[in-house]
Amino acid sequence: MDYNIELYKKDSKNEYRYALGVLSERTLFVIGLNPSTADEQSPDPTIRKVMGFAERNNYTSFVMLNLYPQRSPYPDDLPYEADKDELKKNITIISDLIKSQKEANVLLAWGNNVYSRAYLLESLNLIYKNAIFSNH
């Protein structure tokens, strides 16, 4: 799978990344904890793993999303309180992208760090309600 990013949603300061990838007829949506360093030019180790997984499982593209959009290669550096506006924007973007597909395959991909901040589980709950299991 080539790294030809067509979908790159971020804030103006590049502190928050909401979506990274390509939409196609067979897209794998991956929801991680938070974005690290990947951008539209260069993948990071997580994105390389996602690309390999998607390719091995016959997906033609991927879109990387996250429970919280703040960039940090170290999840422990995330704030203890979420920026509610950023969280809301992130949920809206995720919901819109997933709902835009006739059929959406979603891979949830994070470790125990999901329990480190209450808003991460809150975000998961909102994604579940608004995007994954709502009526298209």
Per-segment meaning from a language model:
Residues 33, 67, 110-112:
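Short, well-ordered beta-to-alpha junction loops that form the rim of enzyme active sites
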Residues 25-26, 59, 102-105:
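A general structural motif
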Residues 60-76:
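Short connector loops at secondary-structure junctions
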Residues 1-44, 56:
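Active-site and ligand/interface coordination hotspots across diverse enzymes
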Residues 2, 72, 78-136:
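Glycine/proline-rich loop-helix segments at beta-alpha junctions forming the active-site rim
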Residues 47-55:
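Short catalytic helix/loop segments, enriched in acidic residues and glycine
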Residues 29-31, 63-65, 107, 132:
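Hydrophobic/aromatic beta-strand patches that form the interior of the parallel beta-sheet core
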Residues 46-47, 90:
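Amphipathic coiled-coil/heptad-repeat helices and related helical stalk/stem segments
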